[in-house]
């Protein structure tokens, strides 16, 4: 998990030193017992990592680690953030650390909510604020499309590998975000969308954002999960409808 990965990186500083760590060294890390230390020590197979790298190269996907300048500082402080993320697009350290606001909400939304999402995205991007969302149907896509039309910067956090477009009808939007923003995922190429991945994805949306605006959402929705993560991360959360 992310907690163990961060503990390993904190102790050994880089993946190469983790790879060559002795069993006794692994045991010294808090949260790693004998069983887990043995698993880490015995699972030293580079073939899987090489396959991921090949797939990334094939699909023009880049990798950021928690030690990179483009990894957002506002997200680094949380222990449940991945130490590695995959991305496509045009991030810079300045862009990744400028003010950002998440606009999230229902897939099936009212006309009023749709217009609110569009108006918010335009007003915020006018101020140079990054729009963060999940490229889902409804509020997400309305906000991100409006941001791009207004020549703003947007980050789409996906719940699958970046070689897959989900939902499939958002191929054009995905291409536009890659050219004028950033596509981001903790999942390597080839990982298909699964229901369990989207709530986890929402924690990254929350961590990347200084504020979270829920335009319209039903009980138990992904947007409210994002809002809950935001509150846990001490972000400003605004619920409009």
Model regions and ranges:
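Short, positively charged patches
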Residues: 1-122
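Glycine-biased, small-residue-rich flexible motifs in mid-sequence functional cores and linkers
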Residues: 65-241
């Amino acid at each position: 998990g992310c907690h163990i990965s961060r503990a390993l990186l904190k102790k050994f500083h880089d993946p190469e030193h983790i790879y060559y760590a002795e069993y006794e060294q692994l045991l010294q890390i808090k949260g790693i017992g004998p069983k887990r230390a043995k698993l880490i020590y015995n699972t030293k197979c580079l073939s899987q990592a090489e396959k991921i790298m090949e797939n990334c190269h094939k699909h023009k996907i880049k990798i950021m680690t928690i030690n990179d300048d483009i990894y957002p500082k506002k997200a680094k402080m949380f222990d449940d953030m991945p130490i590695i993320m995959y991305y496509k697009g045009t991030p810079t350290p300045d862009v990744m650390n400028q003010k950002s606001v998440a606009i999230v909400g229902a897939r099936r939304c009212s006309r009023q909510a749709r217009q609110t999402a569009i108006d918010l995205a335009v007003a915020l991007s006018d101020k140079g604020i990054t729009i963060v969302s999940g490229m889902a149907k409804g509020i997400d896509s309305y906000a991100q499309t409006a941001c791009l039309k207004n020549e703003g910067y947007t980050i789409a956090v996906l719940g699958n590998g970046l070689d897959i477009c989900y939902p499939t009808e958002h191929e054009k939007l995905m291409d536009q975000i890659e050219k004028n923003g950033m596509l981001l995922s903790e999942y390597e190429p080839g990982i298909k969308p699964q229901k369990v991945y989207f709530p986890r994805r929402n924690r990254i949306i929350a961590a990347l954002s200084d504020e979270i605006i829920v335009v319209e959402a039903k009980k138990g929705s992904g947007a409210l999960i994002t809002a809950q993560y935001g509150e846990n991360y001490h972000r400003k959360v605004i619920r409009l409808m």
